Amino acid sequence: MTKEFNYGTGRRKTATARTRLYPGTGVIEINGRPYEEFFPRKTLQMIIRQPLVLTKMLEKFDVKVNVAGGGISGQAEAVRHGISRALLELDAELRPVLKRAGFLTRDARKKERKKYGLRAARARYQYSKR
């Protein structure tokens, strides 16, 4: 039995994207909506397409993504990470290309926690000398 789709999980900040790649015509769907509708910003749309454009597979696959958590920027980058991992599952020879572009690296930066005695993670309360 052959697999009908390739799967990849992408993460960024608190966003998680579960990505499935089906052989198709280049339709990208996020949470049941077209990606242009889900991410109206052109920069975020470009981020999502990057791995497919880089590997010249934009018109060869339909992408279905379920994304949750985080904000729009984190979600877009999580989707990019997920698509890259799914492409890797499809063809392991794409690893050097995707790795060089930095699409396989999980961006581990997260929000720093607030510390007690401070106003935020590093910001202090205003100091009054007198």
Curated annotation (Swiss-Prot):
Whichever gene encodes this chain, its name is: rpsI
Cross-referenced PANTHER family: RIBOSOMAL PROTEIN S9, SMALL RIBOSOMAL SUBUNIT PROTEIN US9M
Question: What keywords is this UniProt entry annotated with?
Answer: Ribonucleoprotein, Ribosomal protein
**Cellular component per GO, a single term:** cytosolic small ribosomal subunit
Q: Name one GO molecular function term.
A: RNA binding
Q: What is this protein called?
A: Small ribosomal subunit protein uS9
SUPFAM superfamilies, per database record:
Ribosomal protein S5 domain 2-like (SSF54211)
| Family affiliation | Belongs to the universal ribosomal protein uS9 family.
Q: Name one GO biological process term.
A: translation
Under Gene3D superfamilies, the record lists: 3.30.230.10
One family from Pfam that matches here is Ribosomal_S9
Question: Which source organism?
Answer: Nitratidesulfovibrio vulgaris (strain ATCC 29579 / DSM 644 / CCUG 34227 / NCIMB 8303 / VKM B-1760 / Hildenborough) (Desulfovibrio vulgaris)
